[in-house]
């Protein structure tokens, strides 16, 4: 992306030079963490759109976030770190910032581990340096000094919030827990813009709606601790969503013509230090969807066109591992695992984690990708899904509760308040930044049926705030809600009764719906893939673990992909397009008579290529880029074409667009790169044939984009 922005001329281009890398570093600092296998692992799915003008200039960027691993905030896996930003702030804050944020050297934070106050020196130095880089990145990405200060204060508030301890006050008649370290409570309340007493009440009590009546639940120390962690996770996820949306407001353009989309997911998850939960299930489901999309794109999508062209016999069938059955197990409607768990969650508390697994087994016990397991140490049933990357065993503990993802209405009332309230008591946080994070756009709430000023339910949407761009120009399709989808579907055969909550959105179903829209967009583009292989599991340089690499290569099917692409024809054009593109060299060969198809046949014979290298279909001619580059160069040599001073090989290209699904620009870019490789490895230094083919291809681009900038290099 940096190379694309550097090559972009003008004032807007000079801004993008700093804005795009800055925005990437900001999201990386707040969304990445050090894991056992990666020192900078992304903990959220990211879809980035590079937006281009009609002249092929990069003009904007839009980023969508998918499923941030918010549980890491309060409970990082054993041996792994929390999100980078916490360590950056603790290690890199200035003396004044430390004093204001109460980040003393002796302070240790529960959310960073027991030794957070004294990290190893090298890591601390690196974190401190990166904090300085982060502040510069925030500035370049369009954040004001006030926003930077408020962001750092909220991150510090989350760290201090994790240090709150609860106990039972025997001198009071109530059974609710109280905060033991009141000085930390006062500090957190000050940072959040509320009173310490109001914050303590929100943490020690929980309001629930039972049969249209509000009930107050007294929380013991363990319950208050869980409530504290829920608030910390909510604050961090809202902050992350706000950061991303603020960047989009600065960099996203509505008047772009085409785009290049980059989709990146955390790799398949299989925890060793703790049980796999709904978070790992959703990430593995997304990877399963992506793997299936890649498989269909590489092995299946072009076959109907080849058959219609009458050239399917040139493409031998390659046997590959098809994960469609596993995907059907996960997302089939009705009756897939996601559909069942959503239905069970909506009928809570009548349905539990145990009944959910029972419904799984009743529907899928004989499926090859599903296996019912033994109860875990806590007595909760387990089940195993045989993903494409390998079997993963999930504990059902907390699945229903996490899938509902209910946000305590007390937190919303405390921090957002109610601006329509007649009394001034429920005004919310006096910190406008905190209050803004809990806006109606970020938090969906449900009011009491008899009192609109009383919030009885709240939820943070799992979908990104924006939708991916679609094929229609100048329109943004909103992501359909799960309720819209479920209205058109039959209930699961195990779910005869209607959901008790009237179709409350659930995490798994909403995430599936968001992925549906994303892959609909990806299906309208020309896809390219990058397979990431980890050389070893110890993050050591110059080390290659053969068994680990072999397993990764097998799981993504690289051998099958290679076999398939040996016989593919990525370069395709109609007979007329072929004749028009190579009209000048064909005339030099004396090929000027006959139909377009006959001219292609004459060219193939003159170049000495077989029908396997240049395949004539009923409507199109298919070319192999390597053979094409070598053959055309040989033609130029044999017929002594007039040479000119070499102008160098320019890699001008246009991005593949939804309207130009064939991705002509991308195909020519690949031809250009292959031509350069061939010229460097196969052509003696005295030969200079490359400029002629380059001229023909540049002319083709100029006909499509007349105003192509002369310095648009890729």
Predicted feature residues:
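Long, non-coiled-coil amphipathic alpha-helical linker/lever segments
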Residues: 130-132, 189-235, 619
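Alpha-helical coiled-coil scaffolding segments
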Residues: 195, 200-206, 334, 537-538, ...
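Helical/strand "switch-coupling" subdomains that flank nucleotide/phosphate-binding cores, especially
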Residues: 55-59, 74-207
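Core structural elements
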Residues: 123-127, 151-165, 191, 206-214, ...
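Extended, low-complexity interaction tracts enriched in P/G/S/Q
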Residues: 1-76, 84-91, 210, 214-226, ...
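Calmodulin-binding IQ motif alpha-helix
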Residues: 551-566, 608-714
């Amino acid at each position: 992306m940096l190379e694309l922005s550097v090559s972009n001329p003008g004032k807007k281009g000079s801004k993008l030079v700093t804005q795009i890398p800055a925005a990437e570093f900001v999201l990386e600092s707040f969304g990445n963490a050090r894991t056992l296998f990666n020192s900078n692992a992304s903990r959220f799915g990211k879809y980035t759109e590079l937006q281009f003008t009609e002249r092929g200039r990069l003009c904007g960027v839009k980023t969508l976030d998918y499923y941030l691993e918010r549980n890491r905030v309060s409970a990082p896996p054993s041996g792994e770190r929390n999100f980078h930003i916490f360590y950056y702030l603790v290690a890199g804050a200035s003396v004044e910032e430390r004093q204001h944020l109460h980040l003393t050297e002796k302070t240790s934070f529960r959310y960073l581990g027991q030794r957070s106050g004294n990290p190893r020196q090298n890591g601390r130095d690196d974190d401190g340096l990166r904090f300085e880089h982060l502040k510069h990145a925030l500035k370049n990405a369009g954040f004001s000094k006030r926003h930077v200060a408020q962001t750092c204060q909220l991150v510090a508030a989350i760290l201090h919030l994790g240090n709150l301890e609860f106990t039972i006050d025997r001198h009071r008649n109530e059974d609710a827990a109280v905060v033991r370290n009141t000085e930390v409570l006062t500090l957190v309340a000050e940072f959040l813009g509320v009173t310490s007493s109001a914050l303590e009440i929100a943490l020690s009590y929980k309001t629930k709606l039972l049969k249209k009546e509000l009930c107050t639940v007294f929380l013991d120390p363990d319950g208050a601790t869980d409530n504290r962690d829920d608030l910390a996770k909510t604050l961090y996820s809202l902050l992350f969503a706000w950061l991303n949306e603020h960047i989009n407001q600065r960099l996203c353009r509505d008047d772009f013509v085409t785009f290049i989309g980059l989709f990146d997911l955390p790799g398949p998850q299989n925890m060793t230090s703790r049980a796999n939960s709904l978070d790992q299930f959703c990430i593995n489901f997304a990877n399963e969807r992506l793997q299936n999309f890649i498989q269909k794109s590489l092995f299946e999508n072009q076959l109907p066109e080849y058959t219609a062209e009458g050239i399917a016999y040139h493409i031998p069938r390659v046997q590959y591992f098809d994960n469609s059955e596993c995907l059907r197990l996960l997302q089939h409607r009705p009756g897939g695992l996601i559909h069942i768990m959503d239905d069970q969650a909506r009928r809570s508390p009548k349905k539990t984690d145990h009944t959910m697994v029972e419904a799984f087994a009743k529907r899928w016990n004989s499926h090859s990708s599903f296996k019912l397991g033994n109860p875990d140490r806590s007595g909760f049933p387990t089940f195993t899904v045989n993903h494409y990357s390998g079997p993963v065993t999930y504990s059902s503990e907390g699945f229903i509760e996490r899938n509902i993802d209910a946000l305590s209405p007390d937190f919303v009332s405390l921090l957002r308040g109610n601006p329509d309230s007649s009394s001034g008591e429920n005004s919310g946080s006096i910190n406008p930044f905190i209050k803004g994070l809990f806006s109606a756009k970020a938090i969906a709430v449900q009011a009491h049926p008899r009192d609109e000023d009383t919030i009885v339910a709240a939820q943070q949407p799992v979908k990104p705030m924006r939708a991916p761009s679609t094929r229609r120009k100048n329109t943004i399709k909103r992501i359909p809600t799960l309720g819209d989808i479920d209205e058109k579907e039959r209930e699961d055969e195990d779910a005869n009764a209607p959901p008790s909550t009237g179709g409350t959105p659930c995490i798994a179903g909403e995430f599936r719906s968001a992925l549906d829209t994303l892959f609909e967009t990806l299906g309208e583009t020309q896809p390219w893939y990058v397979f990431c292989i980890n050389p070893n599991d110890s993050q050591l340089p110059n080390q290659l673990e053969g068994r680990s690499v072999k397993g990764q290569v097998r799981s993504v099917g690289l051998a099958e992909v290679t076999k398939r692409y040996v016989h593919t024809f990525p370069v395709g054009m109609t007979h007329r397009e072929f004749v028009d593109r190579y009209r000048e060299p064909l005339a030099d060969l004396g090929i000027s008579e006959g139909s377009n198809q006959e001219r292609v046949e004459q060219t193939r014979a003159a170049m000495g290529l077989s029908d396997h290298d240049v395949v004539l279909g009923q409507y199109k001619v298919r070319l192999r880029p390597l053979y094409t580059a070598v053959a055309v160069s040989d033609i130029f040599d044999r017929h002594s074409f007039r040479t000119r001073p070499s102008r160098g090989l320019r890699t001008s290209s246009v991005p593949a667009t939804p309207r130009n699904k064939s991705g002509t620009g991308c195909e020519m870019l690949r031809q250009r790169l292959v031509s350069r490789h061939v010229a460097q490895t196969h052509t003696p230094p005295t030969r200079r044939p490359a400029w002629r083919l380059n001229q023909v291809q540049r002319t083709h681009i100029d006909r499509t984009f007349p105003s192509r900038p002369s310095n648009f290099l890729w």
